[in-house]
Amino acid sequence: MNVNVINHPLVRHKLTLMREADCSTYKFRTLATELARLMAYEASRDFEIEKYLIDGWCGQIEGDRIKGKTLTVVPILRAGLGMLDGVLDLIPTAKISVVGLQRDEETLKPISYFEKFVDSMDERPALIIDPMLATGGSMVATIDLLKAKGCKNIKALVLVAAPEGVKAVNDAHPDVTIYTAALDSHLNENGYIIPGLGDAGDKIFGTR
């Protein structure tokens, strides 16, 4: 499976705090931002760099910068917005693309009700953010949309993943790497990740 579980002590600590049943909206939202920031550091580890010259205090010196078009961050509405600030804290120049999905009542498959992509998608790396990778349907649909725009370098950043969701993404898009803070046990009969986080969107937006 093309999945990278970020096993950093701070990531594990903060994720456990999010799992607490009495975690407040403020605390949950803050931790989601902090985790996204830490995890984005790992997800950006293989960014390609190039050399260029700058004027330093002692004269001209050679330095490094990220090569190519700026990353586009792609939150899946609405829960993905809860991770956006954390990624932007680390990569403030990132461009933001947005995808909104809903379930077709006949096919039960996710369909797009809103999508807004930045320009030159075929030249940019994309980082999809969503707290939960459960069945994988929304993630697969989002990757489909990105590839239809010509995007070739795609990663997914999620707080918690279920094996079922990871398998769905890997089966449909084996070239996409998933970064997660935890690979949990399974989905229950209602499609919730166990032990998971509950409804991350409701907890982030205070609508639970």
From Swiss-Prot:
Pfam families: UPRTase. It comes from the Bacteria. One of its GO terms (biological process) is uracil salvage. Allosterically activated by GTP. Keywords: Allosteric enzyme, Glycosyltransferase, GTP-binding, Magnesium, Nucleotide-binding, Transferase. Transmembrane segments: none annotated. Disulfide bonds: none annotated. Its cofactor is Mg(2+). Its EC number is 2.4.2.9. CDD domains: PRTases_typeI. GO terms for cellular component: cytoplasm; cytosol. HAMAP family: Upp_B (MF_01218_B). Belongs to the UPRTase family. Catalyzes the conversion of uracil and 5-phospho-alpha-D-ribose 1-diphosphate (PRPP) to UMP and diphosphate. This is Uracil phosphoribosyltransferase. It comes from Neisseria meningitidis serogroup B (strain ATCC BAA-335 / MC58). The lineage of its organism: Bacteria, Pseudomonadati, Pseudomonadota, Betaproteobacteria, Neisseriales. The gene is upp.
